[in-house]
Amino acid sequence: MKKIGNRAAAVAAFALAGAVSLAACGSGGNGGSGTGPSGHVTIKVGCEPPKTQAAQRSFWVQDVAAFEKANPNITIVSDDTNPCDDPTTFNAKLASGKMDNVFYTYFTDATNVISSGQSADIQKYASQIANLGSLQPDLVNLYRQGGTSGGDLYGIPKSNYTLGLVYNRSLFQRAGLNPDQPPTTWAEVRADAKKISALGGGIVGYADYSAVGTGGWHFTAELYSLGGSMVTSDGKKAAFDNSTGMQVLQNLQQMRWTDNSMGSKQLLQYNDLPQMMGSGKLGMYVGAPDNVTFIHQQYRAPYANLGEGPMPGTGGTLLGGDGYMFSKNDTPAQIQAGIKFLNFEFLTPGAGQFNFARAKAAGQPVGLPQPNIWTAGSSVAQSTTSDKEKNATIPVANFQPYLQAAPNMTAKIEPPQAQAIYAQGDRVMAAVLTQRNPNLQQLLSTFASQTNTILANG
């Protein structure tokens, strides 16, 4: 499951089909060309923002033009197919060998792509990657075999997020709670949810998902927060049919039925929770920091009323994110050109995604604690943070509880075959939230059995 900003509708068009004619020279495929006359290189790069995201699209077009002006021997062909990584078609496209020269991936795709043999090992060009030593090692290792540094590298991370607790600062104040100190344990979430629900008027203290894959996603996040794992270390078996998995279900059952702090409307999905938060009727829910800007933009909720706290619990938090990998058909020149463009667009403070002054001038939100790809304390992290705060258009203080806890949180990636597993998890979450006395052990064991089948067939 992805953060709010990635939930775009699928578009059937294949962008810039006519650009294939540019590939007449050289040996590279996938819409780009290898080194042509006078050393000219053409590369096709995935995930150009769609036209519906006008500001982001404009920034991309500006950056491509600036990059090509600075590098006249490189032509960028942008692919705006969206979603950038459609789970329903990604594997088939990968198997066909028709990926872009520089193709977009979620973190959860990396292992499968490497195993498929469809991506190029770029380790020999690692010295050309800007600020590689300042990137969080755990993020870089996601693009290595086995997730550890072993002399190979198949991709470059560009952004990441970890889940936390989105909360309504205004309701906290009304309930006599400190809006600068959101709960940090599930026991505190439960206690605060009761106080917020007691305000009446249809206000819900805490809400959770249970439909369209979102329920299984949040079950995973809440399991991680308690120190649990969805799958065994080898990724072959379910690992949540235990006391930790049971604790997730019991906690929700108690808040829903004993405390009555989760409201009666259930089977919630995607935008339901941001909408409830935006209407001032919800106190807390698990979500990434970008939910705050989405709630403000979509539902006109004042930024002053919104905050982000850490994921409750001491176990950890769910990590998501994305990056780029390189087609196995790329020539060395295409790989190096691709790295140079990714450096420009995603890995240089003050440029591309880190051009906060431009974003501010365009009326875009600046100040979110994501992406957070740099190692804490590094000079790159410090300069990026300083520039972001200088250009902030949202109250960065409202994210301080999240930021202060982040260095001590263990971030865990989603399980393999995540979407299929999440769909089965919906049934468990729905049962707990719609039935007063379901058989929790039976629900958990059935979910584990279904997960084992998914992993075995993956």
Where in this protein do the model-derived segments appear?
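Hinge/lid segment of periplasmic solute-binding proteins
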Residues: 107-162, 218, 305-307
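Glycine-centered hinge/linker elements that transmit conformational signals in sensory
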Residues: 192-194, 234-266
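Conserved C-terminal helix/tail region of periplasmic/extracytoplasmic solute-binding proteins
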Residues: 173, 179, 394-458
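Extracytoplasmic/periplasmic solute-binding protein
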Residues: 145-158, 163, 173, 187-238, ...
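Extracytoplasmic/periplasmic substrate-binding proteins
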Residues: 112, 218-221, 250-344
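Short, solvent-exposed loop/beta-turn-alpha elements that line the ligand-binding surface or hinge
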Residues: 123-138, 182-184, 205-210, 228-248, ...
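Conserved N-terminal structural module of periplasmic/extracytoplasmic solute-binding proteins
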Residues: 2-116, 427, 436-458
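C-terminal lobe and pocket-closing loops
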Residues: 295-301, 314-319, 325-423
